[in-house]
A protein has these predicted regions:
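C-terminal functional module detector
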Residues: 1-10, 17-169
């Protein structure tokens, strides 16, 4: 069975909740989800590791190459050769790609920049590739992540990237 909803368990989603506030304060971490009880198949902590060893998995977690989901959803969030969790500098406006493979069609896929929803796609497909280039990129550091919501309510959160833009003036 599914776990209680956020409304039932903690009084609802708070837009300025724990994760958003921590990111705005400059903390750098990746997303993962897990249950605090014996239920299975209601939350997934997923890791992009170079191998299936303890060392490779821990190394990937230290790089923040992880994401969270409430179902068996594949997410691959990249900006050029960089992936979720990375910190890097670019002289161009960042261009992102998210590849999603869900268990149901995605109702919406939202790109978040510095706590603001800056782009929303409505793919209506269980498998999709979405690209987005930040039209408002400015010099300085911003974080970006992606949240996907399937039509059946299942969610996926691709971990943030921290990108420092050094655009020509």
């Amino acid at each position: 069975p599914r776990a209680p909803t956020a409304e039932d368990a903690i009084g609802g989603w708070r837009p300025k909740g724990f994760v958003n506030l921590a990111l705005l304060k400059g903390y750098k971490f990746s997303f993962e989800s897990s249950s605090d009880h014996g239920s299975t198949h209601i939350s997934y902590a997923l890791v992009y590791a170079e191998g299936n060893t303890r060392e490779a998995i821990v190394a990937a977690m230290k790089k923040r190459h992880t994401y969270a989901a409430t179902d068996n959803i594949i997410a691959d969030f990249r900006c050029g050769e960089h992936m979720m969790g990375d910190e890097f500098t670019t002289a161009e406006a960042p261009k992102f790609r998210i590849h999603l493979e869900g268990t149901a069609p995605f109702a919406k896929v939202v790109f978040v920049k510095d706590d603001l929803e800056v782009f929303t796609a409505t793919p209506d497909k269980a498998q999709c590739d979405i690209t987005w280039k930040d039209p408002d990129a400015k010099n300085g550091t911003s974080y970006y992540y992606v949240r996907g919501e399937q039509k059946n309510g299942e969610l996926v959160w691709a971990s943030p990237m921290w990108i420092t833009c050094t655009l020509a003036k």
